[in-house]
């Protein structure tokens, strides 16, 4: 997950935010790999990962394309380009992966030069997503595909049995994020992907949603993502001023690892997290 240089997200190119990206990628890995397989991208094809973040999605895409397939990842920040290059350096697919610094709204590529464009958890950060989608369409060959993945965070369940508290936390997070997304929160913008696709001229689009579901005992990837990204970052101290004292105390009791009521060590814990893949084909 990444964004264009003028659209900051989280801690930007910092080490802390690189950790956020990798934790999310690893948490969703089985479902994202399945989504990539279900796309049935042509063997040996050439595609883009716009906003490639730490490079894991680009790697999984390359692995799905066979020995002749190639993936070019774009990131606006040089630091993340270097991280992505290091991330894949030991993979057998490394020779088929390239990472460049670039803006997804102005790709430095010729018209009709690639077979597909993948953009994961990025489009909602771009102030003009229609402009970005039209740029994706420009570089696609006739019959090429635009593929937008969005994590449906507003529909996620991380506090089973505490729906009122979870709704309060989600509303507070939406309010906090409006300073970045403008009048619409990031969560709202995620849900408007088909609207943007339609406005860009992608009249026929397809949706497939994958449910990330984890249960106790949690594996390391799930626990790291839920604890460090959801509980500590998304629902951490930055929301304290947006919640009443009772809600904050309940959040602390359930989400802090040293609390007797800590959820993630309970044998009955589970979580649900929908991930949607929107795709459309460019007319020939």
Language-model regions, residue ranges each:
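N-terminal, positively charged/glycine-rich alpha-helical extensions of SAM-dependent methyltransferases
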Residues: 1-18, 26, 30
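Conserved alpha-helix/loop element of class I SAM-dependent methyltransferases that forms part
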Residues: 26-43, 60
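Class I SAM-dependent methyltransferase SAM/SAH-binding core
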Residues: 46-50, 54-106
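A short acidic, Gly/Pro-enriched loop at the edge of an enzyme's catalytic core
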Residues: 105-116
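A short SAM/SAH-binding and catalytic strip from SAM-dependent methyltransferases
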Residues: 115-130
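A short glycine-rich, Lys/Arg-flanked "PGG" loop and its adjoining helix->strand segment in the class I
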Residues: 130-145
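Conserved catalytic/acceptor-binding region of the Class I
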Residues: 147-220
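Conserved Class I S-adenosyl-L-methionine
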Residues: 206-284
């Amino acid at each position: 997950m990444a964004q264009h240089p003028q659209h900051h997200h989280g801690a930007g190119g910092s080490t802390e935010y690189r950790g956020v990206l990798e934790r999310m990628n690893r948490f969703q890995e089985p479902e994202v790999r399945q989504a990539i397989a279900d796309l049935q991208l042509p063997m040996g094809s050439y595609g883009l990962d716009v906003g490639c973040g730490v490079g894991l999605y680009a790697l999984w895409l390359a692995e799905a394309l066979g020995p002749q397939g190639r993936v070019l990842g774009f990131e606006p920040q040089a630091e993340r380009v270097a991280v992505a290059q290091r991330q894949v350096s030991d993979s057998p697919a490394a020779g088929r992966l390239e990472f460049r610094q670039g803006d997804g709204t102005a790709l430095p590529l010729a018209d009709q030069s690639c077979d597909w464009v993948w953009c994961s958890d990025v489009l909602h950060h771009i102030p003009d997503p229609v402009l970005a989608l039209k740029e994706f369409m420009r570089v696609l060959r006739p019959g090429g595909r635009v593929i937008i993945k969005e994590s449906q965070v507003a529909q996620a369940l991380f506090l089973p049995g505490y729906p009122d508290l979870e709704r309060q936390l989600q509303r507070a997070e939406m309010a906090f994020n409006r300073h970045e997304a403008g009048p619409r929160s990031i969560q709202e913008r995620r849900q408007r992907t088909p609207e943007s696709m339609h406005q860009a001229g992608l009249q026929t689009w397809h949706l497939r949603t994958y449910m990330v579901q984890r249960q106790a005992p949690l594996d390391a990837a799930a626990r790291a993502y839920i604890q460090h990204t959801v509980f500590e970052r998304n629902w951490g101290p930055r929301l304290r001023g947006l919640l009443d004292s009772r809600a904050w105390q309940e959040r602390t009791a359930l989400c802090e690892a040293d609390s007797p009521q800590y959820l993630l060590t309970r044998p009955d814990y589970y979580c649900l997290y929908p991930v949607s893949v929107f795709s459309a084909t460019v007319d020939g």
